[in-house]
Regions:
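Sequence signature of WD/YWTD-type beta-propeller architectures
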Residues: 4-181
Length: 181
């Protein structure tokens, strides 16, 4: 461990754990497009204090690590390279956790990389839980190849009794999303 963040390399000694890793979001055994943003995740292991993740595909390896916050953040450039080189193939994911008795290796899982890219943008309305009235509400656009999110339209940043209106969030112009991009 270097500073607060462990070094991203496979531990020299570890025990094989005959259990599946619990991650959030659950990205185990899924198919992803080759241009998707890095699939950062949290490892849920209440007694572990450090984590190392190894992605392996077609002669390439990508490593990521986390301390006791368990948040795995994947380098964007390395992620893009790994996915582009593995279109139509699987990438194996091995996760190691440092527990009080030493490192363990969870059962590996795979991520299949599709040949086809995903459309870059998704638009959606973002509303507060229990939404009943025209309050703070907006239509947003997210770039699925990055983490960039932009408002297309926001009703109100703050509640205003005299200035609330429908923003037509159920309909796109002439039923088409083409003009949203």
């Amino acid at each position: 461990v270097v500073g607060c963040k462990p070094k991203a390399e496979v531990p020299v000694q570890f025990a094989e754990a005959d259990i599946e890793v619990n991650i959030y979001p659950d990205y185990k055994d899924i198919v992803v497009p080759p241009n998707i943003a890095p699939l950062n995740f949290i490892v849920r292991d209440s007694i572990a204090t450090a984590y190392v993740v190894q992605f392996t595909g077609k002669g390439q390896e990508l490593f990521a690590a986390a301390a006791d916050d368990a948040v795995i953040r994947i380098d964007t450039a390395e992620w893009r390279s790994l996915l582009m080189e593995n279109k139509g193939n699987d990438v194996s994911v091995d996760i190691y956790a440092k527990r009080p008795n030493g490192w363990i290796h969870y059962k590996p899982y795979k991520i299949s990389i599709a040949e086809e890219p995903i459309d870059a943008f998704l638009s959606y309305r973002l509303i507060e839980p229990g939404y009943e009235l025209y309050r703070q509400l907006g239509i947003y656009q997210r770039n699925l190849t990055t983490f960039e999110e932009k408002p297309i339209y926001e009703n109100n940043r703050e509640y205003d009794d005299n200035n609330n209106q429908c923003i037509n969030c159920h309909n796109y112009r002439m039923g088409s999303t083409e003009s949203m991009l």
